[in-house]
Amino acid sequence: MSLSDEQVQAEMHKMVSFIKQEALEKAKEIHTLSEEEFQVEKAKIVREQCDAIDQTYDMKLKRASMAQKIAKSNVLNKSRLEILNSKQKVIDDIFSRVEKKLDGIEQKKDAYTKFMADLIVQAMELLGEPVGIVYSRQRDAEIVKAAIPKATEVLKSKNGSIDYELDAETDDFLNDSVLGGVVLVGLGGKIRVDNTLRARLEIVKEEALPEIRRLLFGENPNRKFDN
């Protein structure tokens, strides 16, 4: 039996209503899934951002710690350098005073003449030659002339079989910065012995420096070598 128009319309309305309901439920399902995916994605992004922030913080913390260590090390090194410079200034001042006391030593003529004779003898013994040219400061020229005979006499008393020849250089003089003393030259200038007060002071400075440091500043527990 065929349906009436009213029945057909009613069935159509039911179908439309069913389709709408299905569509609504599907839309709701899609919305729910989208919301869940959104929340999952959002949580993922938040977690990644938090991890990135943590990594950045750790990196900056490490850099800050390293910078602090470097700054501390620089300060310590600077302090040590300043202390070392201060100590060196004290030592330099001591030897500077010694140099000032040596200035004008030639004025004590008798004592200086004997001292110069001793220096010439020492230099000749180191030279190992019977013939030597004695170089000195110009201000010491007269004292050297007086000291050479004394030195020759001492040398002959030690080695009577050797004929020593000592001459003072009268044209080419040593610089006043040598503080005094002599330079002996032998074998036509091939051998040279520096027995000036400057050279002797440098030797004393090198040998006495560890003891001077101990006297001035005490023992250094960190120093392994005495130099």
From Swiss-Prot:
Gene3D superfamilies named among the record's database cross-references: 6.10.250.1620, ATP synthase, E subunit, C-terminal
Q: Recorded GO terms, molecular function?
A: ATP hydrolysis activity; proton-transporting ATPase activity, rotational mechanism
Intrachain S-S bonds = none
Pfam (any one): vATP-synt_E
Per UniProt, the keywords (alphabetical) are: Hydrogen ion transport, Ion transport, Membrane, Transport, Vacuole
Localization, per the record, is: Vacuole membrane
The cross-references to InterPro entries, in alphabetical order and at most eight, read: ATPase_E_C, ATPase_V1_Esu
Name the domain of life: Eukaryota
Q: How does the record describe its quaternary structure?
A: V-ATPase is a heteromultimeric enzyme composed of a peripheral catalytic V1 complex (components A to H) attached to an integral membrane V0 proton pore complex (components: a, c, c', c'', d, e, f and VOA1).
Question: What does the UniProt function comment say about this protein?
Answer: Subunit of the V1 complex of vacuolar(H+)-ATPase (V-ATPase), a multisubunit enzyme composed of a peripheral complex (V1) that hydrolyzes ATP and a membrane integral complex (V0) that translocates protons. V-ATPase is responsible for acidifying and maintaining the pH of intracellular compartments.
User: In which family does this protein belong, per the annotation?
Assistant: Belongs to the V-ATPase E subunit family.
Which protein is depicted?
Answer: V-type proton ATPase subunit E
Q: Which organism is the protein's source? A: Schizosaccharomyces pombe (strain 972 / ATCC 24843) (Fission yeast)
